[in-house]
Amino acid sequence: KLYKMKKFLAILFVGVLFSALNFNNSEANTLTIKKNRVIKTKGDVFYKWPHNWKFSYIMEHWKPYAIQEITDNVRYGKTALRFELRSGSCGKTAGSDDCKNGPFGSERYELLPNNNDKDITFKGNVWHTISWYIEKFNTPLAGHNSIWQIHNDGDWAPMFNTDLMFDGLYWQRRTACNVPDIYKKYNAKGNDGCSVSWKENANVKIMDRNEIFDKWNDVIMNVNYTSKDNGFLKMWINGKLVYHYQGPVKPPNKGKGWSNNSTMQFGIYRMAEDGVHPHTQINYYDEIRYAKKKCSKLKLEQLGYSCEKLESQKIEVDTLFN
């Protein structure tokens, strides 16, 4: 009887321990998502951000591991977001099918502005930040791989996006694709016919490969969101000014289908030229902060930066007509 009792207690202990572990795993993720794709977080990933976020695909493509709010790898504070994109994870958005994007499709787990019920756009002089951490991976395939973008919700070209290449991280500017006097020369308009290779666009390397993986990287941006020539974008990475653009940022507003509502979106968006990416990619994001006009409102001293030192830096300016 004593042996049976010990055996029973041992089995009971293992069962309780297993249940506790499962409970902790399920409780570790504090992100929830509604049927309308809108997410809700409980932690401190976002600071003063002016709008909510929604998942990039329709809900039939949602996976519990796709985007989680976690506590075990954070840049600052208590929580960060963990994105996990597995091979073959293409899907449908509200108006398109990434599985039919190119010969092998594209894959996208991103967070977009929640514009289900209202227009969302940034206007004028804005400061915003995003910190990211990418687990190291290797892929034999060429293509594109975006970490975050400055985008619009019309058919215009994305104005700015990152591209993670084999040798490092590139910042791609396509603002020329949204300027009528320029895109008409190429018999193009917006995303239709746009190419980063146009002489009026730019593709600038901003980080070497050995600076990217398995560490937190902090991005600070100061953007004047306007379609006028006095627009600009300055970007610092880990406290160093790496890019400065002067010129229109937002596209013109051409009405239905050609809205120029523009903000930041982030997550994993990738496409390979000669196959489907074979690897699982894991990105973390944290410290997504927003302020109007003044750097000081971002409280960057919490992350170890001085607005005065940031704003004193200079770099060659990129324009439409360099």
Where do the PLM segments sit?
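Intrinsically disordered, low-complexity segments enriched in polar/charged small residues
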Residues: I11-L12, S87
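N-terminal leader/targeting segments
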Residues: K1, G15-V16, T319
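Positively charged n-region of N-terminal signal peptides that target proteins for export
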Residues: K1-F8
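Low-complexity, Ser/Thr/Pro/Gly-rich disordered linker/stalk regions
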Residues: A28-N322
